């Protein structure tokens, strides 16, 4: 940081900069508190979502194993091929205290038997159940993915905000306080010297009676 002029205007300038830096640090702390609150809310949602995903995948795997046993892998593979599809995803960005956070949305993924590319009668009950459970798992997965993207972005922004707070509080503000003290001390010393010179001048040049 460059030194300010050792003048009263320089002192006022440094004090004004210190006030702005202090206000900036307070605003950043408020921002971090809001982001942290949002982060902890999301952590709870993500943990809950992962538990739902674990349960959905457990059901899907169990249903698939049963379908393989009852209908055979070859038949299931022949049904899976026409059932394949592209899933359109919509990614939007919202802002929390100016932080862009992505959100992923998809249409409903669980389909009726007649929407899987084959005649409904082609699907046995166990194969249809396995397909449904896997589609349900994908829905849960996409919901969690959106929240985890948001969680990661918030974590990055909290770290960046903390770095900025530390820079202000540990570097900028102490430097400005030190600079203000230096200028104030120099001005005080200058005032004392001026007072001494004035007294000497008056002593040498007394006013006429």
Curated annotation (Swiss-Prot):
UniProt entry keywords in alphabetical sequence: ATP synthesis, Hydrogen ion transport, Ion transport, Transport
Q: Which Gene3D superfamilies match?
A: 1.10.287.3240
Answer yes or no on keyword Ion transport: yes
Q: Which domain of life is it from?
A: Bacteria
Task: Tell me the Pfam families matching this sequence.
Answer: ATP-synt_D (PF01813)
GO BP, sorted A to Z: proton motive force-driven plasma membrane ATP synthesis
The Gene Ontology terms for molecular function here are: ATP binding; proton-transporting ATP synthase activity, rotational mechanism; proton-transporting ATPase activity, rotational mechanism
What does the UniProt function comment say about this protein? Answer: Produces ATP from ADP in the presence of a proton gradient across the membrane.
Q: Which HAMAP family match?
A: ATP_synth_D_arch
Q: Which family does it belong to?
A: Belongs to the V-ATPase D subunit family.
Query: Could you tell me what this protein is called?
Result: V-type ATP synthase subunit D
Task: Print the organism lineage.
Answer: Bacteria, Pseudomonadati, Myxococcota, Myxococcia, Myxococcales
């Amino acid at each position: 940081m460059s030194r300010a002029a050792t003048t009263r205007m320089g002192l006022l300038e440094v004090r004004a900069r210190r006030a702005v830096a202090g206000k900036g640090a307070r605003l950043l702390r408020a921002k971090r508190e809001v982001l942290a609150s949002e982060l902890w809310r999301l952590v709870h949602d993500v943990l809950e979502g992962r538990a739902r995903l674990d349960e959905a995948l457990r059901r899907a795997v169990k249903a698939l194993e049963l379908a393989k046993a009852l209908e055979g892998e070859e038949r299931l593979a022949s049904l899976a091929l026409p059932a394949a599809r592209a899933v359109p995803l919509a990614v939007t960005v919202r802002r929390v205290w100016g932080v862009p956070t992505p959100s992923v949305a998809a249409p409903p993924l669980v389909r009726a038997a007649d929407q899987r590319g084959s005649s409904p009668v082609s699907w046995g009950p166990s194969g249809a159940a396995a397909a449904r459970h896997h589609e349900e798992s994908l829905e849960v997965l996409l919901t969690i993915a959106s929240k985890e993207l948001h969680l990661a972005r918030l974590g990055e922004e909290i770290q960046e905000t903390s770095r900025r707070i530390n820079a202000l509080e540990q570097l900028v503000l102490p430097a400005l306080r030190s600079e203000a003290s230096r200028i104030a001390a120099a001005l005080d010393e200058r005032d004392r010297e001026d007072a001494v010179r004035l007294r000497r001048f008056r002593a040498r040049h007394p006013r006429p009676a």
